[in-house]
């Protein structure tokens, strides 16, 4: 099974850094970056507002534990948002490419 991983970062440069490391290590097959968004969230008892970047990764579900550990090592946040969305179905050609890309 395959997964989309949703991560928020402090900005585009951090998203690029994480994406490149995970691609080089073949933990992910593909990374998409949405360079800028606004986030509102609770932190230490008050509502915060920050500019962030979105990093979307595509990988096999069995790589998730490794991916989470690695992102936590690299990420600048104390508690990074790392969420998995299972891919239930998709283009067979794309999923084959994804699998082949993870093999190296």
Residue ranges of each PLM-predicted region?
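Positively charged, small/polar-rich N-terminal and surface patches that mediate targeting and assembly
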Residues: 1-104
């Amino acid at each position: 099974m395959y997964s989309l991983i949703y991560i928020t970062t402090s900005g585009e440069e951090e998203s690029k850094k994480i994406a490149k490391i995970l691609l080089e290590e073949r933990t992910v097959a593909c990374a998409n970056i949405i360079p800028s968004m606004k986030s509102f969230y609770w932190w230490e008892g008050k509502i915060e507002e920050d500019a962030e970047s979105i990093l979307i990764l595509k990988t096999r579900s069995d790589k998730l534990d490794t991916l989470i550990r690695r992102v936590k090592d690299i990420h600048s946040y104390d508690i990074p948002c790392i969420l998995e969305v299972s891919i239930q179905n998709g283009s067979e050609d794309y999923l084959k490419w994804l699998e082949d890309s993870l093999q190296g």
